[in-house]
């Protein structure tokens, strides 16, 4: 019995923690959270909502407080309300590639969901390694710290390393930090106030 306990304690939490996290997220119908991103362009704070098969809503807190973006996969367009919530006035209809609706690092609204983020991490993992460090806590929540690092000479969109902190129970990312080949931080993203499979109002993603 003691031997079985020791084996269980020393076994990896997941054979592939990134694939396990992605599988959990792919099983969700949607989620909402507060996203805090820090990079060379400063800080962005967004109240973010996602619903399958790809509906996205961003309510901006910083730097463009009050702006609202909604992406609908059925139209392939982003509706932008620069100064207020939808329903009060007509929004601008833009392509996802328009610079007005891209982040300071060039991220597109239609490629902003957590599943896409993890698939980007997997691209680095395919050309390198993933390892789980000692159990830790983030904001008082038990978490798995996973490091994904490309082999020398490899990079995916400048990124050669990701540090991820996954919620120990849900495997949902709580924080993701990316680094370039010089070891300099490209971006740090914190995901807070996470609500999985919420009941969105019927007009939450309406244009």
Identify the function of each model-found stretch.
Residues 57, 61-69, 77-79, 125-207:
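Gly/Pro-enriched, hydrophobic low-complexity segments
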Residues 45-49, 68-74, 87-102, 188-191:
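Short amphipathic beta-strand/extended segments with alternating polar/hydrophobic composition
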Residues 13-84:
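N-terminal mature ectodomain segment of secretory-pathway/periplasmic proteins
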Residues 79-116:
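Acidic/charged, solvent-exposed loop-and-adjacent secondary-structure segments enriched in E/D, K/R, S/T
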Residues 1-10:
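Sec-dependent N-terminal signal peptides
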Residues 109-112, 118, 159-164:
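Glycine-rich, flexible loop segments associated with nucleotide phosphate handling
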Residues 23-26, 111-125:
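Short, solvent-exposed helix-to-loop capping segments enriched in aromatics
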């Amino acid at each position: 019995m003691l031997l079985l306990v020791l084996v269980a304690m020393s076994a990896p939490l997941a054979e592939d923690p990134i694939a396990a996290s992605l599988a959990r997220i792919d099983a969700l119908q949607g989620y909402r959270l507060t996203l805090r991103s820090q990079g060379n362009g400063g800080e962005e704070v967004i109240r973010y909502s996602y619903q399958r098969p790809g509906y996205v809503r961003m309510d901006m807190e910083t730097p463009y407080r009050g702006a609202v973006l909604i992406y609908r996969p059925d139209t392939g367009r982003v509706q932008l309300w620069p100064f207020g919530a939808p329903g009060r006035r007509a929004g601008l209809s833009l392509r996802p590639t328009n610079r007005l609706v891209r982040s300071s690092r060039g991220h597109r609204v239609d490629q902003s969901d957590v599943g896409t983020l993890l698939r980007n991490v997997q691209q680095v993992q395919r050309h390198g390694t993933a390892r789980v460090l000692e159990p830790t806590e983030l904001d008082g929540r038990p978490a798995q710290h996973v490091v994904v690092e490309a082999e020398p000479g490899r990079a995916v969109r400048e990124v050669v390393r990701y540090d991820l902190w996954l919620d120990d129970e849900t495997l949902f990312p709580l924080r993701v930090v990316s680094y370039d080949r010089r070891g300099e931080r490209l971006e740090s993203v914190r995901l807070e106030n996470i609500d999985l499979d919420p009941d969105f109002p019927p007009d939450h993603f309406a244009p």
